[in-house]
Structure formats: C-alpha cells, structure tokens
C-alpha cells in the first residue's frame, strides 16, 4: 500500500478487501456505516502504514475527528466503534480509488473545464490534507487522469489568459515617457530625444544655462554707485554660490571675504563702507569679486585705469583686517603690525593723516580726510591691537585734543615694537 493514503481511504480499502471481517466490517452497507470490530488491530495496521509503531485507538479516534469537520466521516451516536461515511453512494460508485463524498463532487460544478473523474481524485486529496498518489497498480490510471486534467487546466483559458493579461499592461509604460518627453524637449529648447533617460536632464540643463546667462547680466547692469553696488554684490554672491561656480572665477580675496562673512564681520563692512566717498569705495570693493565677463572688466578698467594697479597691494590688507581678530586673537599682532596699528591710530581724526602718509601707503582707503566716528569705531574694533591700545580711548573722546597729541608718540613705538602697545588691563 502507498503510505500517502489518507485514513478514510485506508478504512474504505480494508472494508472492500476480503479477509478483514474480523477487524472491520459493514453494519449497513447501503447507509455507509461500518464498525471497527478490533479497533486496536485497525490502529496497529494504520500505524504500520504510517511507520508509527505506537499507534493505538485513542490516536486513531482523534485522527477520525479531523474528518468530522470535513463532512467525510462522522461518528454514529449510541454505538461504540461505529462510524459512517456521510455520502456513501458516491464512495461506493468509485473503483479501487477512494473517492471523496458528495461535498467534494459539488466542487466540480465550479470548474466545468476539468474532467469530473480527475476532480474526484485531486480535491479528495486536498480535503484529506495529503497529496493524492496511487495506492497500487490499479491507481495508475486515475493518477494519469489527474496529470492530464492538470495539463488541460494549464492549457485552458483560465490560466493562459491570466498570464497574457498580466504581461499586456507592461508594454504601455514604455511609450508613455516617449510621448511626454518630446513635448518637454521643445519647451526647454533641448536636443532631439535620443532616449527616454538621455532627454530627461536636457530641460534642466537648459534652465541652468538660462540662469547662468542671466547672472552675469545682473552684475554688468549694476550702477557704479557705492551703496547700490555693495547691496547688489551681496545679492549676487549667494546666487553665484548657489548656481554653477565654474561660470564665475573668484580670486582669493573673495573666498576669504566670505569666510570672514561667516564669522560675523561682513555686516560691519556693509555698515562702514557706504560712508566712504564713491571715488575710493569702488576700488576698495573691486578686488572682492572679479568676473570673467569682458564688459564689466572693460567698464571698470576704462573708468578707473589708475586704480587697477594699487589693487594688488590692497588685497592682503583688505583680507587681514577682518580675519586678524579671529585668527590672531590680539596676543600675536606681529604678522600685520603696520596695518593693525595704522588702522587703530589713524582713526582718531583727520589731523593725524598727514603725518602718517609716508608710513602707511599700503592702505589708501584709510587716508580719507573725511572719516566719521562710525568708521573710526569700525577700524578700531577690527584691528588686533586696538582693544588693548590707548587708541580705544581716542574713540571714546574723539573731540579731545589731548588724545590726538598723545597718540603719535605711541604709534611710533607701535610701528617698531608692537608688543608695547598693550599695557592696559582691558579685555578684548
């Protein structure tokens, strides 16, 4: 016997075989009732079939309860060891193969394309929870019917149409991007689409090129006035940093000026420089940003040819002033003694500028005869020596003549030995 046979099929086989009347027998063949004459022997034979030597009737009865829910076998009440096949006529009509009862035959009505004989075998196995395999040589024919029914189902429209329908929706997504991309390509004035992926970045590049083309135009059209030029430079710098940097060539002073802006010194520059006259304010800002456009370079070079040469000398000075407080911190002003002391000592008033002209030619922006107290405060706070030098007192009393007379003597010492300029205990 095949070990894959279910329990109800095993009992039906025992009932049909001759010579098993001493262990199992029909009590009502027409009604499908049978009795386990020797329940323990039946359980032992079932254990041998399943390779379980410890099988007994208790385990066999629990296994039979599984078929109660399946409506295949039920216990006859009031009689011990008596069971009944729920739909025995269908079971008796089968051949050597054990067929499922009536509830399983109703399943065939839902699948008209499959042969009824094959359904008797396959669903019966699914009901029992075990695969249907032939019990012996006589089972080979029904097994072949089961395979043929499966092949018929595979060839039937239920399976093939489902597979074809699942594959049909896939081709449409490919032409859909192709239809959308040609419409986007003329809008962005890009090249003709060579592929769905190659044409997608073209509108973005066109937009970026349009933005790059628009940014230099804004710089060229700016008026040469000092306050407006500074405000427009501040607006253009973040835009240039946000757009493609390769279009804009920025020299060293601009990069360090942006670093100083991050440390909080650019706002002071915007407050102090608009007070400088336009003639000297424009050359002071020109080294900050240098563009590749020929129109801007030619315009400023034609307007101020004599100013373009001193820019090279002013570049380090414009950068060291905002960066010196954060990098040096006051204790070590030896790197820029001239610029630090000059910026802190020239600030008090216009009376000191003629005396310091030969010693401070590298900072012409500070030599304005019309410097105001806000600019004095700006240069005194940015110089590394000013917070500790008596120059801060000159800012607190800009109108006093005694402070202006006292500063030149200290400035001479500051130029030679900058360490002497920090005698006060004031904190930076």
UniProtKB/Swiss-Prot annotation:
Instruction: Report the record's Gene Ontology biological process terms.
Output: cell differentiation; cellular response to gamma radiation; cellular response to testosterone stimulus; gene expression; hippocampal neuron apoptotic process; liver development; lung development; positive regulation of DNA-templated transcription
Positions where Phosphothreonine occurs in the chain: 336, 353, 363, 368, 417
The record's subcellular location field reads: Nucleus
Q: What is the effect of changing residue 368 to A?
A: No effect on ternary complex formation
Q: GO molecular function terms here?
A: chromatin binding; DNA-binding transcription activator activity, RNA polymerase II-specific; DNA-binding transcription factor activity; DNA-binding transcription factor activity, RNA polymerase II-specific; mediator complex binding; RNA polymerase II cis-regulatory region sequence-specific DNA binding; RNA polymerase II-specific DNA-binding transcription factor binding; sequence-specific double-stranded DNA binding
Xref: InterPro entries: Ets_dom (IPR000418), ETS_fam (IPR046328), WH-like_DNA-bd_sf (IPR036388), WH_DNA-bd_sf (IPR036390)
The record's section on SUPFAM superfamilies has: Winged helix' DNA-binding domain (SSF46785)
**Biased composition annotated in UniProt, kind: Low complexity:** 177-205
In its record, the post-translational modification comment is:
Sumoylation represses transcriptional activator activity as it results in recruitment of HDAC2 to target gene promoters which leads to decreased histone acetylation and reduced transactivator activity. It also regulates nuclear retention.
Position of the Glycyl lysine isopeptide (Lys-Gly) (interchain with G-Cter in SUMO) cross-link? 230, 249, 254
Signal sequence residues = none
* GO cellular component entries: axon terminus; chromatin; dendrite; mitochondrial membrane; neuronal cell body; nucleoplasm; nucleus
Keyword Iron-sulfur carried by entry:
no
Basic and acidic residues bias located where?
Answer: 248-261
Ranges in coiled-coil conformation: none
> What single Pfam family name could you report for this chain, choosing any that match?
Ets
Q: Which residues are glycosylated?
A: 381
Q: Which residues bind DNA?
A: 5-86
Q: Which SMART domains match?
A: ETS
Q: Which intervals of the chain are annotated as region Sufficient for interaction with MAD2L2?
A: 349-399
Outcome following mutation: residue 389 to A: 34% reduction in ternary complex formation
Concerning its family, UniProt says: Belongs to the ETS family.
Q: How the protein assembles, per its UniProt entry?
A: Interacts in its sumoylated form with PIAS2/PIASX which enhances its transcriptional activator activity. Interacts with MAD2L2; the interaction is direct and promotes phosphorylation by the kinases MAPK8 and/or MAPK9. Interacts with POU1F1.
State the PANTHER family in the record. Answer: ETS, ETS DOMAIN-CONTAINING PROTEIN ELK-1
Q: What does this protein do?
A: Transcription factor that binds to purine-rich DNA sequences. Forms a ternary complex with SRF and the ETS and SRF motifs of the serum response element (SRE) on the promoter region of immediate early genes such as FOS and IER2. Induces target gene transcription upon JNK and MAPK-signaling pathways stimulation.
- The identity of this protein, by name, is ETS domain-containing protein Elk-1
């Amino acid at each position: 016997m095949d070990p894959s046979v279910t329990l109800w099929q095993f009992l039906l086989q025992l009932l049909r075989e001759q010579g098993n009347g001493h262990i199992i027998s029909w009590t009502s063949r027409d009604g499908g009732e049978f009795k386990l004459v020797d329940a323990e022997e039946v359980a032992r034979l079932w254990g041998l079939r399943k390779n379980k030597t410890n099988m007994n009737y208790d385990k066999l009865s629990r296994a039979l309860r599984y078929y109660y829910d399946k409506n295949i076998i039920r216990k006859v009440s009031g009689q011990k060891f008596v069971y009944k096949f729920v739909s025995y006529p269908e079971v008796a009509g089968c051949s050597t193969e054990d067929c499922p009862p009536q509830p399983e035959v109703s399943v065939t009505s839902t699948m008209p394309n499959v042969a009824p004989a094959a359904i008797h075998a396959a669903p019966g196995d699914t009901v029992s929870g075990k695969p249907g395999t032939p019990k012996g040589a006589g089972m080979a024919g029904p097994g072949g019917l089961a395979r043929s029914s499966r092949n018929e189902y595979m060839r039937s429209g239920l399976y093939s149409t489902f597979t074809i329908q699942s594959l049909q929706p896939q081709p449409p997504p490919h032409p859909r991007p192709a239809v959308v991309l040609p419409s986007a390509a003329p809008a962005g004035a890009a090249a003709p689409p060579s592929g769905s992926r190659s044409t997608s970045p073209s509108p973005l590049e066109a937009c970026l090129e349009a933005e790059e083309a628009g940014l230099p135009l804004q710089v060229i059209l700016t008026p040469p006035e000092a306050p407006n030029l500074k405000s427009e430079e501040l607006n253009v710098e973040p835009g240039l940093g946000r757009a493609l940097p390769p279009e804009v060539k920025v020299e060293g002073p601009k990069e360090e000026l942006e670093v100083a802006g991050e440390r909080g010194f650019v706002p002071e520059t915007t407050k102090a420089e608009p007070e400088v006259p336009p003639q000297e304010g424009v050359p002071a800002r020109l080294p900050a940003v240098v563009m590749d456009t020929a129109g801007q370079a030619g315009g400023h070079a034609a307007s101020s040819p004599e100013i373009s040469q001193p820019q090279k000398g002013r570049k380090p000075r414009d950068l060291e002033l905002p960066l010196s407080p954060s990098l040096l911190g006051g204790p070590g002003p030896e790197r820029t003694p001239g610029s630090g002391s000059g910026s802190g000592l020239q600030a008090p008033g216009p009376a000191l500028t003629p005396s310091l002209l030969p010693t401070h030619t590298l900072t012409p922006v500070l030599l304005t005869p019309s410097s105001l107290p806000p600019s004095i405060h700006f240069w005194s706070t940015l110089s590394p020596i000013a917070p500790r030098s008596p120059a801060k007192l000159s800012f607190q009393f800009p109108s006093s003549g005694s402070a202006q007379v006292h500063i030149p003597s200290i400035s001479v010492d500051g130029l030679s030995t900058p360490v002497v300029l920090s005698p006060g205990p004031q904190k930076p």
